[in-house]
Swiss-Prot record:
Record bears the keyword Transmembrane: yes
Organism lineage string: Eukaryota, Metazoa, Chordata, Craniata, Vertebrata
SUPFAM superfamilies, A to Z: Cytochrome c oxidase subunit I-like
Family: Belongs to the heme-copper respiratory oxidase family.
GO biological process terms on file: electron transport coupled proton transport; mitochondrial electron transport, cytochrome c to oxygen; response to cadmium ion; response to methylmercury
Topological region Mitochondrial matrix: 1-11, 87-94, 171-182, 262-269, 328-335, 401-406, 479-515
Superkingdom classification of source: Eukaryota
Functional summary from the UniProt entry: Component of the cytochrome c oxidase, the last enzyme in the mitochondrial electron transport chain which drives oxidative phosphorylation. The respiratory chain contains 3 multisubunit complexes succinate dehydrogenase (complex II, CII), ubiquinol-cytochrome c oxidoreductase (cytochrome b-c1 complex, complex III, CIII) and cytochrome c oxidase (complex IV, CIV), that cooperate to transfer electrons derived from NADH and succinate to molecular oxygen, creating an electrochemical gradient over the inner membrane that drives transmembrane transport and the ATP synthase.
Organism: Latimeria chalumnae (Coelacanth)
Broad class of where this protein is predominantly found: mitochondrion
Amino-acid positions noted as binding Cu cation in the UniProt annotation, renumbered to this chain: H240, H290, H291
Protein's name according to its UniProt entry: Cytochrome c oxidase subunit 1
PROSITE patterns hit by this protein: COX1, COX1_CUB
Length: 515
């Protein structure tokens, strides 16, 4: 029974739960790695060993957090759980492929962890640039194992993307148009399209790197007529859409949370929200070289990428102000998910503003590869994506389990987490402006103060993670059952009770055609 249910599952709710649990474990691994980084940097001098070990930890931290924490939880966990419920589908379009998408991830994580354990590990950074990632600077199997790990995670995401696109377009009730689906559906649809278009390019790039390393090809080796800059273009053509893949489902979740706790039946400016997400998805593909301002591109090329990058701020602003407009004039229910959503809106906006700064190619020459960049993307990831995940978890936990989290504990947890991440990442702006470079395990004494502050912040975040584990245990232990859910007519995922039965919508939902 256990084996057929959890290993061979074709049920979207069970697979979503598997994704959630996997993401939680990977999140703890990624958090542990981040604490190793902050411990090393808490004061000048060496702690763990040389820079190779340090960079292996940094690389593993990035890969684990991106591919095994944020994406599995947001897309695999929330996507699987909510999308069929929100559109009235009995399950995903391809339930067995859905199962394979999940089970490709544990071996992928295993390969990634193995890459750290053999030879000297892959100390390349998550970008895996040659020639550092070539077979001279990284002899041995480490980088090859990392590449295979990425291949598996990539195949998993591509299959998942196909599944989500098919489900969202094809499994709605016949009278329901795409413009009647909730915003979370749209966010995952756009995300899936981005995955489908960007991952094959990454696969091509890392496959060429694999053959450069093992089969004597010279795609990225000038000695044989290749060009390492080609790899950068291929990687970032995937890498930039990837960061939007990480945040877009969060946008969808935040829209639902803000509308729900404002007591509104719908978010402000539904169509604007939809088009903003589609615009972000499109623009995300034509700005990739802003990661490469320092490699010597023509001035007109740099001018274009600066301008195009800044244009993304417009649809993003549409979303931020629509969230604020949704809050306006509502009957605000100050529950924990709303706190996460408000934290998201504020901190994501701060991260977006530093992004505008970095979009200026001339400024980026100075700030590239400094802690200013680290601060920027951790504001949008560690306080954007993670806050969205936390808000979504606290909001939908009763739906997924049938139990309620402790109201006071979750609020305290939010406060601790908010303090921790801000104390960790805000000082890094100062370090970057003062010229401290990324990816070094040691630094001049002048940078000591803010690094120490940052590392103390990371310990506060650790306390928050441990608190959250306790909060989950407490909920399953106390077993407070859900009494009533408000506004189910505009939040249809709650219609079947908490938790919903194993199979929902076994006969098609009736949707009144618009007059």
């Amino acid at each position: 029974m256990m084996i057929t249910r959890w290993l061979f599952s074709t049920n979207h709710k069970d697979i979503g739960t598997l994704y959630m649990i996997f993401g939680a474990w990977a999140g703890m691994v990624g958090t542990a790695l981040s604490l190793l980084i902050r411990a090393e940097l808490s004061q000048p001098g060496a702690l763990l060993g040389d820079d190779q070990i340090y960079n292996v930890v940094v690389t593993a931290h990035a890969f684990v957090m991106i591919f095994f924490m944020v994406m599995p939880i947001m897309i695999g966990g929330f996507g699987n759980w909510l999308i069929p419920l929100m559109i009235g589908a009995p399950d995903m379009a391809f339930p067995r492929m859905n199962n394979m998408s999940f089970w490709l991830l544990p071996p992928s994580l295993l390969l990634l962890l193995a890459s750290s354990g053999v030879e000297a590990g892959a100390g390349t950074g998550w970008t895996v640039y040659p020639p550092l990632a070539g077979n001279l600077a990284h002899a041995g199997a480490s980088v090859d194992l990392t590449i295979f790990s990425l291949h598996l995670a990539g195949v998993s995401s591509i299959l998942g993307a196909i599944n989500f696109i098919t489900t969202v377009i094809n499994m709605k009730p016949p009278t329901m148009t795409q413009y009647q689906t909730p915003l979370f559906i749209w966010s995952v649809l756009v995300t899936a399209v981005l995955l489908l278009l960007s991952l094959p390019v990454l696969a091509a790039g890392i496959t060429m790197l694999l053959t450069d390393r093992n089969l004597n090809t010279t795609f990225f080796d000038p000695a044989g007529g290749g060009d390492p800059i080609l790899y950068q273009h291929l990687f970032w053509f995937f890498g930039h859409p990837e960061v939007y893949i990480l945040i877009l489902p969060g946008f969808g979740m935040i829209s639902h949370i803000v509308a729900y706790y404002s007591g509104k039946k719908e978010p402000f400016g539904y169509m604007g929200m939809v088009w903003a997400m589609m615009a972000i998805g499109l623009l995300g593909f034509i700005v990739w070289a802003h990661h490469m301002f320092t490699v010597g591109m023509d001035v007109d090329t740099r001018a274009y990428f600066t301008s195009a990058t800044m244009i993304i701020a417009i649809p993003t602003g549409v979303k931020v102000f629509s969230w604020l407009a949704t809050l306006h004039g509502g009957v605000t229910k100050w529950d924990t998910p709303l706190l996460w959503a408000l934290g998201f809106i504020f901190l994501f906006t701060v991260g977006g503003l530093t992004g505008i700064v970095l979009a200026n190619s001339s400024l980026d020459i100075i700030l590239h590869d400094t802690y200013y960049v680290v601060a920027h993307f951790h504001y949008v990831l560690s306080m954007g994506a993670v806050f969205a995940i936390m808000g979504g978890l606290v909001h939908w936990f009763p739906l997924m389990t049938g139990y309620t989290l402790h109201n006071t504990w979750t609020k305290i947890h939010f406060g601790v987490m908010f303090t921790g991440v801000n104390l960790t990442f805000f000082p890094q702006h100062f370090l970057g402006l003062a010229g401290m470079p990324r990816r070094y395990s040691d630094y001049p004494d002048a940078y000591t103060l803010w690094n120490t502050v940052s590392s103390i912040g990371s310990l506060i975040s650790l306390i928050a993670v441990i608190m959250f584990m306790f909060i989950l245990w407490e909920a399953f232990s106390a077993k407070r059952e859900v009494l009533i859910v408000e506004m189910t007519t505009t939040n249809v995922e709650w219609l079947h009770g908490c938790p919903p039965p194993h199979h929902t919508y076994e006969e098609p939902a009736f949707v009144q055609a618009p007059r």
